[in-house]
A protein has these predicted regions:
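Intrinsically disordered, low-complexity activation-like regions
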Residues: 1-231
């Protein structure tokens, strides 16, 4: 996990035995087709025009995170005894393809966004000091890649920015994510939280009514839009 917090490739290769044990427990996950039903989490990664351009290995890893997210949304962590093993495997895979994604803004922004999502939404490492470097890396790559991604996949850019906004809570970078979320929300005509939530769930997102942070971020976005209208 230290490699994830430092955004570096894994120091040690994955044990063949451990990998076999993890993959052998895959029956806990439901079979999910790429052409998902609208109610299925993560469907936008596979049924959008821009998704055809994704690196095959990155698509496979996103598919794995999609299955993990679906299980967490429907069963909860307590009912998935091998969750930590599967998450460690998925993050190891995500870190291992850094070289393949680096040349493409779309691929690298997506890779970093999924990494941040796994650390904040699933494992709740958001308060750790090393998270600042992860959030900084995502924002730095979005600074160059966001214009293109926003043009070809505004829905994806909204999800990436929202993930970054969640991870940047209490950090100076929060304002940057909020400002760009306000812009993309306007582009997508997102007016209400329920509509924004439906879009987020089309990617990777676990909504917990008892957790106020996502809606609090959305309220910041709405206040930012109001400020821009008054300016």
């Amino acid at each position: 996990m230290s490699a994830a917090l430092k955004i570096s490739t894994p120091v040690f290769p994955m044990s063949v035995r451990w990998k076999s044990e993890v993959l052998g427990s895959s029956d806990i996950f439901p079979t999910m087709n790429d052409a998902a039903e609208p109610s299925m989490v993560g469907g936008r990664f596979f049924d959008s025009l821009w998704s055809k351009a994704l690196h095959p290995t990155l698509r496979t890893i996103v598919r794995l995170f999609r299955r993990i997210t679906h299980c967490l949304s429907t069963m909860g962590a307590a009912e998935i005894p091998v969750l930590n093993e599967w998450l460690a495997y998925a993050i190891h895979q995500l870190l291992s393809i850094a070289h393949d994604c680096m040349a493409s803004d779309l691929h690298e922004c997506l890779r970093l966004s999924v990494l941040v999502y796994s650390m904040v939404e699933i494992k709740t490492f958001g308060g750790l000091p090393y998270m600042s470097s992860v959030v900084t890396a995502l924002r730095s790559r979005l600074r160059t890649g966001l214009p293109q991604i926003q043009r070809i996949a505004p829905d994806l850019s909204f999800w990436m920015l929202f993930v970054g906004g969640m991870a940047s809570k209490g950090r100076a970078s929060r304002a940057w994510f909020v400002a760009h979320l306000a812009e993309v929300a306007e582009q997508l005509s997102l007016k209400e939280w329920d509509t924004a939530l439906a879009l987020l769930e089309g990617f990777l997102f676990i909504y917990q009514p008892a957790c106020p942070q996502p809606e609090a971020l959305w309220n910041e976005v709405k206040r930012q839009q109001a400020l821009e209208l008054d300016a």
